[in-house]
Amino acid sequence: QSMSTLHQEEAFEKADQLSLKKTLEETEAFHKKLNEDHLLHAPEPVIKPGTAYKNQVPINVQAHPGKYIIESRYGVHTLEINDDTRFHSGASTLPPSXYASRFEIHFQPEIQXYRNGVPIDAEXXGAPAIPKYNDYIIITXKQPAVDGGSPILGYFIDVGIGXPSRVSEPVAALDPAEKARLKSRPSAPXTGQIIVTEEEPSEEAGTENXQRVNTELPVKXSNNAGVXEPEETGGAEITGYYVNYREVIDGVPGRXREANIKAISDEAYKXEEXTIAVPGPPHMTFKNRARVVGGLPDVVTIQEGKLLASDEHXNLKYGSEISDFTVSVFIPEEEARSVA
């Protein structure tokens, strides 16, 4: 008899474990489905009623446990009243005698942005207001007219940069179609200068430094590129410059070289191996790109102006002509169209 009782207890315990395991699995499946349903719909604000009333009298759920059941799910609020007046020792399950009417609340929330306690107008509906020419922008997406009835879960935004000067960076690796599309954008006006000298400029970089070149020194394997800060930057702060140059000998352009890999903030930068000891006047094209706080600029400026830096060697005399220069600054695309 004791063995039979022990087997019964083990059977009951195993049944309880199986029942608990089944309950946990059902609960997990329910929450998983609930999460998937959450992801398929846009979040909606829900207002839950503070108090339920019956015959103009507030209902106290704690005072009558089991009689009143108030639930709020998916924006639908229900009140269930169980009328159980019979008393007996057995358990009884009675259907509810009355249900409160189903109702839903629909409203449009109002979003208001503040700065320093003062309300401000947002540039795009539902987005925080920001000052112009900041280091980030707000992109709004419109729902397509025909979507086949399928729910839209999100949007993908493609971003590209034009005329990359840092080829080593992965973000600058664009396909030919992207490069062709970016090259077709309108150009912004030139906003800076590059001056090449054989000495460190003693004063602020400017066009007058191009005329002050020491012709008594022998030809060096480097040049000093002086950079003047652009006058128009679109309100963005310049944090440094990238200098690229290319040698053109007898009309044949050489490969473009990067003078610096890291952005420099000095007014002049020494470009190593910028001259070559070959007959003929080598032309040297410099390109300068300004880096702003938001990263590299994506609007290429037009080429404008010519500068001349002359050198003298014991056995060779020639002039190094700076055929053109470019300075890129951050200018919004809308302003670039209006200026072009």
UniProtKB/Swiss-Prot annotation:
**Cytoplasm: present as a keyword of the record?**
yes
- Alphabetic keyword roster: Cytoplasm, Muscle protein
GO cellular component terms attached to this protein's record? M band
Subunit details: Homodimer. Interacts with TTN/titin and PNKD.
Give start-end positions of Acidic residues composition bias: 197-206
Annotated gene:
MYOM1
List GO molecular-function terms, semicolon-separated.
protein homodimerization activity
Classify the source by domain of life.
Answer: Eukaryota
List the top taxonomic levels of the source.
Eukaryota, Metazoa, Chordata, Craniata, Vertebrata
The UniProt annotation puts the region (Disordered) at: 177-212
Tissue distribution = Seems to be expressed in all cardiac and skeletal fibers.
Quote the protein name from its UniProt record: Myomesin-1
Function recorded in the entry: Major component of the vertebrate myofibrillar M band. Binds myosin, titin, and light meromyosin. This binding is dose dependent.
Where, per UniProt, does this protein localize? Cytoplasm, Myofibril, Sarcomere, M line
> Which pairs of Cys residues are joined through disulfide bonds in the record?
none
